[in-house]
A protein has these predicted regions:
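A short beta-loop-alpha structural element at the N-terminal edge
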Residues: 3-17, 28
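Conserved beta-strand in the GNAT
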Residues: 58, 66-76, 92, 97
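Conserved catalytic-core motifs of GNAT/GCN5-like acyltransferases
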Residues: 76-82, 88, 128-130, 134, ...
């Protein structure tokens, strides 16, 4: 299996390609990729911050030089602490995506394992994610458990 590595600024276009694959598989949304051009500068900058709160781990595609096979991205948020988590550092996983022709090879598991270690190293005691039905078995096997969430969202 190809090695997991941290995504670099020069991976930004491939990171967005894989994110789009994930979006297209989960949501009945606008298939346009016009938003990629606006997103690229910020993504490149974030990928270039070695000590930032955002990270992406990738696996290079074994059959397509220059392409990525898998992406896992996450961020750490600070929330005021509580008894079970005095530091208040919470990891959030998003954009777990594998190229359709590279699935079932263990890439997502390898990237997730690397991301979870990154969270641990930075003091996160909890990690959250939203799982698709197809991906839930992977996350459960890594120790995630369903949690009822009264989350409300406002789009500004």
């Amino acid at each position: 299996m190809s090695a997991v590595r941290r995504a670099l600024p020069e991976d930004a276009e491939e990171v967005l390609r894989l994110r789009q694959i994930m979006i297209d598989s989960l949501f009945a949304s606008d298939p346009s990729i016009a938003w990629h051009a606006e997103s690229l500068p910020t993504l490149r900058a974030k990928l270039g911050e070695p000590d930032g709160d955002f990270v992406a781990f990738v696996v290079e595609h074994p059959e397509r030089p220059g392409a990525l096979a898998c992406l896992v991205a996450g961020t750490i948020d600070y929330r005021i602490g509580k008894a079970a988590d005095p530091q208040g550092m919470v990891g959030f996983v998003f954009s777990v995506a594998t190229d359709p022709d590279a699935r079932r090879r263990g890439y997502a598991r390898a990237c997730m394992t690397t991301l979870l270690e990154w969270f641990r190293e930075r003091g996160a005691r909890r990690v959250q994610l939203t799982a698709s039905p197809q991906a839930e078995p992977l996350y459960v096997s890594l120790g995630f458990r369903p949690k009822p969430d009264p989350l409300l969202e406002l789009t500004l």
